[in-house]
Amino acid sequence: EPRELPAAAGGILLFFLLFLAYSMLRPVRETMGIAGGVQNLQWLFTATFAASIGGQFLFGWVSSKVRRKAILPWTYGFFILNLAVFAALVLACPGNVWTARSFYVWLSVFNLLTVSVAWSVLSDVMKPGQMKRLFALVASGSSLGAMAGPAVTAALAGVAGLLWLFLAAAVLLALPMLAGMYLHRWCDGNSPEDAGT
């Protein structure tokens, strides 16, 4: 419906940019996993599982302490800072195996939490009927971002190193953070009667 166009566009943009950032980093993760030692991949899988469980518990605790509108900017802001730290580590200690291993585990937690937060924002700002109608449209943003990410990484890899890939991903992650904040403002500007069911 016409009144839902801003929300649909914001949702598509949110998921496109989020998955673009993730898909840019995924090839880096695989490379770093190998750099950390092929013989250690089994332990990296175990560490990834443990970190994902721990991250979920920590995220649940933090979410219970802050306003729902603040969850997305806090979560995405935290991961943007993480990317800045990885960029600094790559610059200061290039080729460090522990940086590689940490990033391998970190990206899985990043993907799990950022996607969960994105869907929670949509469930906050849209009614169930709207979610049913707009789900496929909004989800198309994730597919487009996932397709574009590796191409962007390949293009940047020829002219920029890991440092710039991390910084580019941090900038891209800041944009879906703004899109999520826009969706909350859109919701505030629409009464329950206007939002429909």
What are these regions (language model features)?
Residues 1-12, 38, 65-70, 88-101, ...:
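Intracellular loop-helix junctions on the cytosolic face of multi-pass helical membrane proteins
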Residues 2-54:
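Helix-loop boundary and gating motifs at the non-cytosolic
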Residues 16, 20, 96-114:
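Hydrophobic core of transmembrane alpha-helices in multi-pass small-molecule transporters
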Residues 31, 60-64, 150-154:
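Small-residue-mediated transmembrane helix hinge/kink sites in multi-pass secondary transporters
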Residues 42-54, 132-157:
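Glycine-rich segments within core transmembrane alpha-helices of 12-TM secondary carriers
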Residues 56-75:
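Conserved MFS/SLC helix-loop-helix module at the cytosolic interface between two early adjacent transmembrane helices
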Residues 75, 137-141, 168:
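Hydrophobic alpha-helical segments of secondary membrane carriers
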Residues 112-127:
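Intracellular juxtamembrane helix-capping segments at the cytosolic ends
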